[in-house]
Each structure stands twice: as structure tokens, then as C-alpha cells.
């Protein structure tokens, strides 16, 4: 028997190496992957559903004031109910990159009100105007995402503002952060002569059925 034939026989008997299974890249979402979250926002959602902060705002923070709010509620959970802390006035622009969040933020909020589909009733606009006068120093910014932003909001006033908005079918939920901030639509839906399809029923269904669902909110 030659060396070549022996080598060939050994090679034939050697089992093939099993193929390694390719690991699926984690998405960083604990509810999707069932793995450790990749960032703090996902970790915080794992510990407590995002919208749970609403009740704490009503029961605790609006009564005990800004200083009672823990950091992990202030960001990101407040974002998910439509509020950012405002930046302090008069800060040197060159120094802002070196300051901490606590040094940058003021004890007031910007609240973003959703206008899904770019549609709002006259009663809704009137309510926003009244809230602006009473609680937001007459501020109201219309954004290119079809939302309205109010500034200088005190935590003590937030429950009252939410209640007034709810009376006219408006809210601030999912207004800020990496969330579906608004459902864009045409403000002339149902009116434009060249319209192919009126998207308002779909927008309304998404707003009522999907957005409040905790399975999607978290």
C-alpha cells in the first residue's frame, strides 16, 4: 500500500467538521431578543413599563415637585409621555458640551402634543391656546412633524394639562424620544379632489388600538 493511498483512506474516514450556526445579531430589545438589553433605555423598559410613569407624575411628582423625580424617570420615561426638560437659560454655548445633564436642565419641561394626521378641531386648538396662556408663558410651536410644543411647563401642572387635553381628544403620549412621535397624514385628507385614498380611518385605528397597547409601548 502506498503512502498516498493510506493518506486518502484516513481522509475519507475523518468526520466532517460540523458547521457553526450563525448567531443572530441581537436587536437590543429585551422583549424581542429575550437577552440582555444593549442600552440603558431598553434596560429601563425591562424594569418598568414606559407609561407607568404617568401615574407617578399624578400621584407623587406633581405634588412633591421637580426635585422628587428620579433620573431614570426624568429620562427616558418622561420622553415617552411627551416631555423633555428644558435647557437652562443664559448658558455659554461653548461650555454646554462639558456640562452634565443636571447642570444643563432647568426645572421646567417642554411638552409635545400629538396632532396625528395633521388634524385638530377648533375646540382642540382653543384648548391648546388656553393651556399656553395658563401654563406655558404663551408659547406654542408648530413642528414639521405635525405636533405642537409648549414650553415652561411645571410638573405641578402636568395632570391638569393632560386632563384638559383629554377632553378634546388630544394627548402628549409618545411625544418625544425614539418612539412613534406622531402618525403623519395629509391635512387635506377627505377634502382634496385628487385624493386616491383617505388615510384618516387607518390613522385613527392605529392611534386608538396600537399606541396604548403596552406590548407595543414597551
Put a short name on every predicted segment.
Residues 1-109:
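Iron-sulfur (Fe-S) cluster-binding modules
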Residues 2-7, 108-218:
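Small-residue-enriched alpha-helical segments and adjacent helix-cap loops
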Amino acid at each position: 500500500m502506498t503512502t498516498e493511498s493510506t493518506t486518502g483512506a484516513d481522509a475519507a474516514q475523518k468526520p466532517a467538521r460540523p458547521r457553526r450556526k450563525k448567531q443572530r445579531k441581537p436587536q437590543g430589545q429585551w422583549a424581542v431578543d429575550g437577552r440582555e438589553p444593549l442600552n440603558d433605555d431598553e434596560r429601563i423598559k425591562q424594569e418598568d413599563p414606559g407609561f407607568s410613569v404617568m401615574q407617578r407624575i399624578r400621584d407623587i411628582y406633581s405634588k412633591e415637585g421637580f426635585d422628587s423625580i428620579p433620573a431614570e424617570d426624568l429620562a427616558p420615561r418622561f420622553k415617552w409621555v411627551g416631555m423633555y426638560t428644558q435647557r437652562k437659560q443664559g448658558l455659554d454655548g461653548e461650555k454646554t458640551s462639558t456640562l452634565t445633564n443636571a447642570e444643563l436642565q432647568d426645572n421646567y419641561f417642554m411638552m409635545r402634543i400629538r396632532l396625528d394626521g395633521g388634524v385638530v378641531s377648533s375646540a382642540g386648538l382653543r384648548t391648546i391656546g388656553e393651556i399656553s396662556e395658563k401654563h406655558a408663558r404663551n408659547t406654542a410651536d408648530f413642528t414639521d412633524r405635525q405636533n405642537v410644543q409648549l414650553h415652561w411647563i411645571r410638573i405641578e401642572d402636568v395632570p391638569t394639562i393632560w386632563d384638559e387635553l383629554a377632553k378634546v381628544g388630544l394627548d402628549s403620549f409618545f411625544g418625544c424620544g425614539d418612539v412613534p412621535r406622531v402618525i403623519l397624514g395629509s391635512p387635506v385628507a377627505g377634502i382634496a379632489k385628487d385624493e386616491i385614498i383617505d388615510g384618516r380611518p387607518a390613522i385613527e385605528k392605529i392611534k386608538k388600538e396600537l399606541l396604548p397597547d403596552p406590548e407595543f409601548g414597551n
